[in-house]
Amino acid sequence: MSKNKYKITELEEILRMKQMTLKSHLEAKLEAAGYEPSSEDGFLYAKGTFPVLLVAHMDTVHKDCVQKIKYTGAIMSSPQGIGGDDRCGIYAILQIIKDFKCSVLFTEDEEIGCVGAEKFAVSDYIVNNDINYIIEIDRRGTNDCVFYSCDNPDFEEFI
């Protein structure tokens, strides 16, 4: 099996999970990557050694989980909706932390009002942290990426 096929299989696995099953799955993935994750009501957080917090949400706008995935060239689709918002962000974070031990935040119920993000924002985790930058990996509409505040000179120097 090619390396790329393995990665697509990992993404497919993430796309098929319900939010709470995914939360348990991600907790195990973080532990396997050397983190000590904290599973709280509304979010899953793991402190890293790199001063960046990577954020994605575990819910999707779609009611049903992906059951069948269709491939048309490099495009994935599903009758249930692919769940790319924000399962692709989760997948991207899992790839990034293989090389950089960033802090990680996976939130619940973003699509119904940022419930998990609000709970994290008032938690002790955000107060007792050495985070210089927060990068939320999410999407909006049909574009590949959305960028906000990319003209920060300090961030540009950091990267």
Predicted regions, residues:
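A non-catalytic alpha/beta surface segment that caps or lines the substrate-entry region
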Residues: 13-50
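Short amphipathic alpha-helical segments, especially helix-boundary/capping motifs
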Residues: 2-6, 67-71, 93, 133-139
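N-terminal hydrophobic or amphipathic helices/low-complexity stretches enriched
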Residues: 1-17
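General structural feature for long, well-ordered alpha-helical segments within catalytic domains
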Residues: 7, 18-29, 116, 127, ...
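General beta-strand structural signal in soluble alpha/beta enzymes
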Residues: 38-40, 54-56, 75-78, 104-106, ...
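Catalytic-core environment of secreted peptidases
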Residues: 46-84
